[in-house]
């Protein structure tokens, strides 16, 4: 053999190489022979690979290796036969066999008429490579086993994959669909049902560690799942894994619970596929981000290595592009597209490309997908999908919850919203409605009143009897995770992060320096827009999910990060928002009657200011300035006027916000910048002078105001509120940390993971982006929860295989909109009498049920899921997520249920390879 042969990476990262030492100058001869004996010879390799050598060298003594070399692979031997084969005393050989079984070099069963115990030298995969990885303590002591498994499940297949026929040719594993996805399929055969195999091995089940999850975790590419108890050994294999400390017996009900939890998490059911149609020895529940069996089809783009006899199909009329099937699809077969007709497609719904297959095409590494774990998570086709879902920073399934609301399924609608937005009642009142700006219906008449429908749905959260508390969906069989996570700041980003961590099975602790949660939602937004009981109700849901809230605690002052680390906290999410304001740097601004907007709003919302007299001047033109002006009007200020640099067209505040401010009595003067604040003899504000702003931005669009110093305007004032920007007040929070700060003192972090230069500190919301909207912070908190979950689970990658969140909107100029009737947009009733009686209470009413029905009927239903049958592996997970009965499995590929024994592999490959060669030669499809 050639020594120091290379590992095979196939353009994937060569992970785990650090666990493979250089081959010794004089390798152990017995181990070299064992490598030759056990290695799959399909490649006809003659090199000695380091990961093979060191794995066998650490697993076997020379004497054990010599015994193994005398055994034929997959041929069972009874104890008398092993005595005869080796010439060893019975007691000695039995102990050696049991020792090698415990290590994982051998397996055993009782598959003979006498039910005598017999030992088997298994193939590498599935076989000894898994067994070596299934006991965590052993794997941690011998991490080279992880590299061995990773390579042994890939390298031998590289040349064979295009020749694998439907059914898999006795190689590896085979997808078996979710039972309820095919339970009504009259054409199904028994081996396609999990129930068939559970019946066959009734009473003999054991739950064991997932070797793929364990292997990837050791090499730093774990998926953050707890590896324990996801794989179900059946029959004699159940006894083997229990007796060798790889698992424990479980009842049939416990098996059902494992299967249900696997489906909830989006794990694919697979069965072993090396013993023909009359035997399996395991049912695995696989995460495509780590599973080596699923990798065989996904890396090489050869689905025959995995797929079942079934293909998912979408009923477009029922589909609402909610994206649930897309998120869960392990093969990237389901993607979001459109169902509106396209001008470019000749007035028809566009057709979508299909994955090329090796059946009639020459296949080499250029056809592979080394980045499949990320590529399979791309959510939309390039041509785009529903603009509402795309435009929403949290990518809420707008089209989906509109349809559920139209059907009166309000609980399900609320559940769907909360998959991406845990604060829908809040957002129904204060969101800046980018979904409506993007709504295709706006090209017909007016955008659908999406936010008003969401507000109606989310009203259920305000009542303990109807609120929706999501169930915990956790990738651990232990019921949840015990790692302690601290969230600093109970604003929208922190609340969102707490919600999604709790949903994942954590019990995060939220530290809030104020006495109430919500951050700027509570202390910044006027109560006539957002009642505080709405915030409390949605926070209560998060508390019921398992989050703990500690109020009146300022991290950095009352407790430090290091002290929290000493208390066992493993990660921190810093989301303290922009709590300070900025001044203009002009004379007189240090007077007592000059304040910044965030301080003014905080005092109003805390009840410290309950009346105002005199004249109030607000400097600034954004939505926060509008809030200040409207509060001042309602508090009784005699004259309220806003001054901003921008023209009316350029003003950051929305047109709706400006209109409401004027209705409240505020005046708006555009094109003015502050020059000087005037004080009387007592040092109190008596006026302010403005100078004409002639230009706000330079030619590159950068903020660079220019003024006409000769065009001045002085106005009387009793107080001035500066609303020209916000600042971050860090205090001593980051003292001693490695967190780096950038422009405006914002924290620097990775744009996808939000991890800072201090690995256990993640940031989000306004401390990362600067002042933004609640929905942006909510989206950031969700992504941070994903990152933190991965961070605190040992050996997990923060990036590989996470949903990309790269949604693309369809081209609204391309869709055919002729033929749609105009339908007036519903408008929420404004109760002016209530507003007069209680100016700081909400006065905009929620839609009625009739209005919801009318408004949801206006949705054009732009998007739909598209399934590529060439990529679909028929797992059926998509069917478990769809709330609209819009996606089903059809038995289009019955030949994929052809299960043959491993020993028939070469004839099966040869027969199919001949057919394929003929197709390639003659160009047949």
Question: What residue spans do the PLM features occupy?
Answer:
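A short, conserved structural fragment
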Residues: 101-112, 334-335, 887
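A Rossmann-like FAD-binding core segment of flavoenzymes
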Residues: 533-582, 595-612, 634-744
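Short amphipathic alpha-helical interaction segments
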Residues: 86-102
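Glycine-rich dinucleotide-binding loop and its adjacent helix/turn
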Residues: 457-478, 504, 537-557, 581-635, ...
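Short, amphipathic alpha-helical interaction segments positioned at domain boundaries
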Residues: 115-154
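Beta1-alpha1 glycine-rich phosphate/pyrophosphate-binding loop at the start
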Residues: 396-399, 405-406, 447-451, 487-555, ...
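Ferredoxin-type iron-sulfur electron-transfer modules and their immediate structural context
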Residues: 33-35, 56-57, 196-199, 203-320, ...
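Short acidic, hydrophobic short linear motifs in intrinsically disordered regions
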Residues: 74-86
């Amino acid at each position: 053999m050639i020594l120091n042969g290379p590992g095979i990476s196939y353009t994937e990262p060569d992970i785990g190489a650090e666990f493979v030492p250089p081959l010794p100058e004089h390798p152990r001869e017995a181990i070299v022979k064992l490598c030759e004996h056990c290695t799959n010879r399909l490649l006809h390799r003659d090199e000695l690979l380091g990961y093979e050598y060191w794995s066998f060298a650490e697993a076997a003594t020379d004497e054990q290796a010599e015994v193994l070399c005398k055994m034929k692979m997959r041929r069972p031997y009874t104890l008398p036969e092993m005595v005869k084969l080796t010439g060893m005393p019975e007691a000695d050989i039995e102990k050696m066999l049991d020792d090698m079984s415990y290590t994982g070099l051998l397996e055993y069963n009782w598959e003979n008429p006498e039910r005598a115990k017999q030992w088997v030298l298994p193939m590498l995969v599935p076989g000894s490579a898994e067994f070596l990885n299934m006991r965590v303590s052993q794997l941690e002591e011998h991490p080279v086993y992880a590299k061995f498994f990773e390579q042994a499940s890939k390298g031998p297949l590289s040349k064979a994959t295009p020749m694998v026929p439907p059914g898999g040719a006795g190689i590896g594993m085979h997808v078996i669909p979710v039972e309820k996805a095919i339970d009504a399929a009259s054409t199904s055969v028994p081996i396609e049902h999990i129930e068939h195999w559970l019946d066959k091995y009734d009473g003999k089940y054991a739950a064991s560690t997932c070797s793929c999850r364990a292997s990837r975790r050791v090499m730093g590419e774990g998926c953050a799942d707890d590896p324990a108890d996801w794989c179900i050994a059946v029959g004699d294999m159940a006894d083997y894994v229990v007796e060798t400390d790889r698992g424990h017996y479980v009842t049939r009900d416990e098996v059902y619970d494992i299967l249900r939890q696997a489906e909830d998490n989006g794990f694919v059911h697979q069965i072993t596929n090396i013993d023909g149609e009359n035997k399996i020895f395991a049912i695995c529940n696989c995460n495509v981000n780590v599973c080596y069996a699923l990798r065989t089809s996904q890396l090489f783009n050869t689905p025959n290595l995995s797929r079942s006899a079934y293909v998912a199909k979408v009923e477009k009329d029922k589909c609402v592009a909610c994206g649930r099937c897309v998120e869960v699809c392990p093969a990237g077969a389901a993607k979001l597209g459109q169902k509106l007709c396209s001008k470019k497609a000749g007035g028809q719904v566009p057709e979508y490309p299909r994955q090329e297959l090796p059946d009639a095409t020459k296949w080499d590494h250029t056809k592979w997908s080394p980045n499949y774990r990320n590529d399979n998570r791309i959510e939309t086709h390039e041509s785009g999908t529903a603009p509402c879902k795309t435009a929403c920073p949290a990518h809420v399934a707008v089209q989906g919850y509109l349809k559920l609301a139209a059907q009166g399924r309000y609980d399900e609608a609320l559940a769907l919203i909360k998959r991406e937005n845990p604060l829908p009642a809040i957002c129904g009142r204060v969101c800046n409605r980018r979904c409506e700006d993007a709504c295709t219906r706006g090209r017909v008449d007016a955008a659908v009143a999406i936010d008003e429908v969401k507000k109606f749905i989310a009203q259920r959260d305000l009542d303990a009897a109807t609120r929706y508390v999501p169930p915990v969906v956790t990738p651990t069989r232990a019921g949840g995770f015990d790692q302690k996570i601290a969230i600093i700041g109970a604003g929208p980003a922190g609340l969102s992060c707490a919600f999604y961590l709790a949903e994942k099975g954590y019990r995060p602790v939220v530290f809030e320096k104020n006495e109430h949660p919500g951050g700027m939602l509570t202390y910044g937004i006027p109560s006539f827009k957002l009642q505080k009981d709405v915030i409390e109700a949605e926070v209560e849901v998060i508390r019921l999910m398992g989050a703990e809230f500690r109020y009146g605690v300022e991290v950095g002052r009352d407790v430090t990060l290091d002290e929290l680390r000493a208390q066992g906290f493993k990660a921190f999410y810093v989301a303290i928002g922009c709590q300070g304001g900025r001044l203009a740097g002009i004379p007189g601004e240090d007077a007592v009657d000059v304040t910044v907007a965030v301080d003014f709003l905080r005092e109003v919302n805390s009840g410290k200011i309950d009346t105002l007299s005199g004249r109030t001047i607000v400097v600034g033109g954004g939505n926060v300035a509008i809030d200040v002006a409207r509060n001042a009007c309602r508090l009784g200020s005699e004259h309220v006027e806003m001054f901003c640099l921008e023209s009316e067209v350029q003003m950051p505040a929305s047109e709706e916000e400006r209109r409401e401010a004027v209705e409240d009595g505020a005046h708006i003067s555009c094109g003015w910048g502050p020059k000087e604040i005037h004080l009387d003899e007592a040092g109190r504000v008596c006026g302010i002078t403005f100078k004409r702003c002639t230009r706000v931005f330079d030619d590159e669009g950068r903020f660079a105001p220019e003024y006409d110093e000769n065009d001045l305007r002085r106005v009387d004032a009793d107080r001035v509120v500066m609303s020209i920007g916000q600042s971050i007040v860090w205090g001593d929070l980051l003292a001693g940390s490695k967190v780096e700060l950038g422009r405006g003192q914002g924290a620097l972090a990775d744009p996808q993971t939000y991890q800072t230069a201090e690995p256990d500190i993640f940031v989000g919301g306004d401390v990362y982006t600067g002042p933004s909207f609640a929905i942006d912070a909510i989206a950031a908190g969700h992504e941070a929860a994903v990152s933190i979950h991965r961070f605190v689970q040992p050996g997990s990658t923060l990036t590989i295989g996470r949903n990309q969140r790269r949604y693309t909107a369809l081209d609204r100029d391309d869709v055919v909109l002729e033929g749609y009737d105009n339908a007036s947009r519903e408008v929420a009733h404004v109760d002016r009498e209530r507003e007069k009686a209680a100016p700081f209470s909400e006065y905009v009413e929620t839609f009625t049920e009739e209005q919801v029905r009318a408004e949801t009927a206006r949705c054009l239903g732009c998007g739909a899921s598209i399934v590529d049958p060439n990529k679909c592996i028929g797992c059926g997970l998509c069917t478990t997520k769809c709330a609209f009965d819009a996606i089903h499995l059809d038995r289009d590929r019955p030949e994929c249920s052809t299960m043959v024994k491993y020993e028939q592999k070469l004839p099966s490959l040869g027969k199919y390879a001949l057919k394929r060669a003929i197709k390639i030669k003659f160009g047949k499809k």
